[in-house]
């Protein structure tokens, strides 16, 4: 095989993704103070290989937060029914994703999930990595066709439920009832 046809076993993008996925798993299991060596081991790369892609811990964590931002958006949009052109379709997808239909978001928002492990300043991390993130979400909700007060109430109630899932504070029955009520609020005609 000519040298120009050879491809590395792992290309740059795949290695970067493997490191970020490993960082998500390891930080979720062991907390934000986990060593870079532990993340590298989980990713199947050397620590110097990790450092090649992420020269500092801060660079790695910024990229990790960026991946979470992207994945959160993708998960919500995956739960928006493409055939639903009624007002509230995006908000319904958001409620479904945050209240149990997305295994990724359930783990992310759990009491021991990645957001909890990153600490109370995780929103500051989000803003530092992607200052446009809040505006992107706000635009999506504002364009959804529901009255503003209703869309914000449903959104923030869904976020509260998401944080309580899997704890003694939100039983399965309470989740079922609250989710049904939130979805019903997105079905009613705009006032």
Per-range role (PLM):
Residues 105-108, 123-191:
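Hydrophobic/aromatic-rich alpha-helical bundle segments in the mid-to-C-terminal region
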Residues 75-112:
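Hydrophobic alpha-helical connector segments
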Residues 18, 22, 26-59, 63:
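Helix-turn-helix
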Residues 18, 89-93, 113, 152-157:
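Amphipathic alpha-helical interaction segments
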Residues 22-29, 75-78, 157-164:
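Solvent-exposed, amphipathic alpha-helical segments
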Residues 111-119:
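Amphipathic alpha-helical elements of HEAT/ARM-like alpha-solenoid repeat scaffolds that form extended
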Residues 1-14, 191:
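N-terminal intrinsically disordered/low-complexity leader segments
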Residues 61-68, 75:
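Alpha-helical DNA-contacting segments of helix-turn-helix folds
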């Amino acid at each position: 095989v000519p040298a120009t046809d050879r491809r590395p076993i792992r290309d740059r993008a795949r290695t970067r993704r493997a490191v970020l996925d490993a960082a998500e798993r390891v930080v979720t299991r062991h907390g934000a103070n986990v060593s870079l060596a532990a993340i590298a081991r989980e990713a199947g790369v050397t620590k110097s290989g990790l450092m090649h892609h992420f020269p500092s811990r801060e660079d790695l964590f910024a990229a990790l937060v960026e991946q979470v931002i992207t994945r959160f958006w993708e998960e919500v949009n995956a739960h928006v029914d493409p055939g639903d052109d009624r007002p509230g379709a995006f908000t319904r997808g958001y409620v479904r994703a945050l209240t149990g239909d997305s295994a990724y978001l359930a783990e992310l928002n759990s009491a021991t999930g990645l957001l909890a492990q990153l600490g109370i300043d995780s929103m500051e991390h989000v803003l530092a990595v992607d200052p446009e993130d809040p505006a992107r979400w706000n635009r999506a909700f504002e364009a959804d066709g529901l009255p503003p007060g209703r869309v914000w109430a449903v959104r923030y109630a869904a976020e509260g439920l998401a944080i309580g899932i899997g704890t003694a504070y939100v039983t399965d029955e309470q989740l079922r009832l609250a989710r049904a009520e939130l979805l019903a609020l997105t079905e009613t005609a705009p006032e």
